[in-house]
A protein has these predicted regions:
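ER/secretory pathway lumenal C-terminal domains and tails of membrane proteins involved
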Residues: 1-253
């Protein structure tokens, strides 16, 4: 409060998006996202579940599309990304998805699509593999692909990106589940939470892509693979599988 009193809002006060809620000191209702930092402002945006929800859409859009430097995460050649850099990339993906969702829910799906296309391009999976943090982006792209207010070209791009990212994440997570259900009881039980999360995420990926691209053969194959995965997991819950089912290795790849 002394800082705010002295600077009279003439100098900005920022909180990094990487800090936890304990560091918000009760000010999260007055946070506004401008990139990878929350700016403290004299406007009450509110919060949800203790998390800030304010976003300066146009300012953050300019930062993302024109000002941010990506530090080589989008490099074409082989690069080494350590755990810290991977975590930061995950944070970038999360915040850009939040920005895109804010545009889409305000009726500006075209701008939301631009942000998501940028996200996929500058944080490629070849350098930082996709994880479940990408699920909201996949679902949002699937929704944008069905937006009648966009051009056919825009809807097609959204569908292509949704399938590209969704298929890759689906393949990775379904492979994880297949590995887990082949384990003996002790290890299988220890992985129960990971299995539940992976099953839930793959189900949502398959469902959102099926809604957006119901006639796409790859999406249909993914839905069939999801059905087989559910059957295998259900059978495994009854005990070890003596004859594990054969899955289509190309589904979701």
């Amino acid at each position: 409060m002394e800082i705010l009193n002295n600077n009279k809002w003439e100098r900005p006060v920022y909180f990094a998006v990487t800090i936890g809620p304990d560091s918000y000191v009760g000010l999260q209702d007055y946070f506004r996202l401008e990139g990878l930092a929350w700016r403290l402002v004299p406007v009450k945006y509110g919060s949800r579940g203790g998390q800030p929800i304010g976003i300066a859409r146009d300012l953050m859009y300019t930062n993302v599309m024109e000002n941010f430097q990506w530090g080589g995460v989008d490099a074409e050649g082989e690069i080494y990304m350590d755990e810290n850099n991977r975590r930061m990339t995950t944070n970038i993906r999360l915040q850009l998805t939040n920005l895109a969702e804010s545009f889409a829910t305000s009726g500006a799906s075209a701008r939301g699509l631009e942000v998501l296309e940028k996200l996929v391009r500058v944080t490629p999976s070849r350098n930082v593999p996709y994880d479940r943090i990408m699920l909201p982006a996949i679902e949002l792209l699937s929704e944008i692909a069905q937006d009648p207010g966009l051009t056919e070209e825009q809807r097609s791009l959204a569908g292509t990106l949704a399938k590209q990212v969704g298929a890759e994440l689906f393949k990775a997570l379904s492979d994880d589940v297949r590995y887990y259900i082949a384990l003996d009881d002790a290890y299988y039980s220890a992985a129960s939470s990971e299995i539940q999360v992976a099953m839930a995420v793959t189900q949502r990926i398959s469902g959102s892509l099926s809604d957006a691209l119901p006639d796409d053969e790859e999406v249909q194959a993914m839905a069939e693979s999801m059905s087989q995965l559910r059957s295998a997991q259900s059978a495994r819950q009854q005990g070890p599988l003596s004859d594990p089912p054969v899955f289509n290795p190309d589904a979701g790849s």
